[in-house]
Every structure is written in structure tokens, then in C-alpha cells.
């Protein structure tokens, strides 16, 4: 089986700034023979977790939306990159609700799978939003993949993001780092390391 990474676009804009950053990462992963998928959350509301615990019993959320569609893909995926625009120094409400529900009852699915956060912002609040996403990985036994700088791009539209040379280089490095770590883990498994 070919290794796979899902890049989650947590922006209500399908092809905006967050997508532009994720697409740059995706290109590097594909150059490294990693299968990819950009999973867009869409532009319809995603309800927050109500803590009912039904997912612990059934394996899926009772709310039938993008959460269950995504959870079906998790077992056959090796790494995840969650991307979000910065809204008031935080992730988009949509991504926050999505991640709460994804990780609430199904955290064990992510154990030892790679995780990384990416944010796009016009000016500020990026590191706070990155920290928010990374907390899900830290509590789920997920190694976090980093880059040469914080995983952020700056711009108010995709054209401005493409002009953020340092940000785009950070995305390329992140893609290469994710591919390298996936290949290292695969080599370790082949050598008998469990």
C-alpha cells in the first residue's frame, strides 16, 4: 500500500489562502511518491461536539456530516495536515468543531500517525492558531511534523500568499519533512521495529 496523507482544508473558501498553502505541501508529498487528498470541510455549518458519547459506542458521530466521512478515511491514512485560516487568533470555528468531534471519541485511531498544523493569516494570530491545532496531536499520541519556521503563510488572497516566499518555502519544507518521516517509519517497520 502506498503511504497516504490527507490535508484538511478548514476554510469556508475552497480555493483560498489555506488551500494555496496546502496545495504547495501536496506538491512536495506527491514528488516523494506519497498519495494525497485535500479534504475540504465545505461551507456549510459543522456543529460542535455535545459530549453525548454515542461515538464511543457506535464508532461514529450521530450527526451525519463531514466528520463521519473523514473518520472512514483515517484507518488507511498515515499522516494528516490540518489547515485553517486565522480568525481572531484562533482556528476557524468550522475546523475547531470538526476537530473536537473527530478526536473526542476516536482519538485512538490517530495513535502513531503523523500530524501537522498549517495556518494562513493576513497579519497576526498565527502562532496561537497553530498551538490550538497542535494540542489535538499531543493528546492523541501523534508525532508532530515541523518545518524550518512556524507553519504559516501570510496574505489576504491566494495571489498574496504565493508572494510570501518564506511562507511558501516553509510549506515545501513541511511537505518534504512529512515524506521523510513517513519513509523513515516505513523503513523502521520493515527492519522489525514496532
Model region roles, listed by residue range:
Residues 37-40, 146:
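A structural preference for short, hydrophobic beta-strand core positions in alpha/beta folds
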Amino acid at each position: 500500500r502506498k503511504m497516504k496523507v490527507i490535508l484538511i482544508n478548514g476554510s469556508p473558501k475552497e480555493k483560498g489562502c489555506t488551500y494555496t498553502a496546502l496545495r504547495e505541501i501536496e506538491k512536495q508529498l506527491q514528488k516523494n511518491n506519497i498519495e494525497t487528498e485535500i479534504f475540504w470541510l465545505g461551507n456549510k455549518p459543522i456543529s460542535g461536539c455535545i459530549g453525548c458519547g454515542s461515538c464511543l459506542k457506535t464508532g461514529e458521530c450521530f450527526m451525519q456530516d463531514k466528520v463521519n466521512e473523514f473518520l472512514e478515511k483515517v484507518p488507511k491514512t498515515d499522516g494528516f495536515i490540518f489547515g485553517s485560516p486565522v480568525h481572531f487568533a484562533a482556528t476557524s470555528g468550522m475546523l475547531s468543531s470538526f476537530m473536537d468531534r473527530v478526536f473526542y471519541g476516536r482519538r485512538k485511531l490517530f495513535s502513531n500517525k503523523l500530524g501537522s498544523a498549517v495556518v494562513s493569516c493576513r497579519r497576526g494570530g498565527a502562532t496561537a492558531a497553530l498551538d490550538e491545532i497542535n494540542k489535538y496531536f499531543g493528546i492523541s499520541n501523534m508525532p508532530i511534523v515541523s518545518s524550518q519556521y512556524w507553519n504559516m503563510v501570510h496574505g489576504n488572497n491566494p495571489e498574496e500568499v504565493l508572494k510570501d516566499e518564506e511562507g511558501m518555502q516553509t510549506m515545501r519544507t513541511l511537505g518534504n519533512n512529512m515524506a521523510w518521516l513517513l519513509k523513515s517509519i516505513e523503513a523502521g517497520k520493515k527492519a522489525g521495529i514496532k
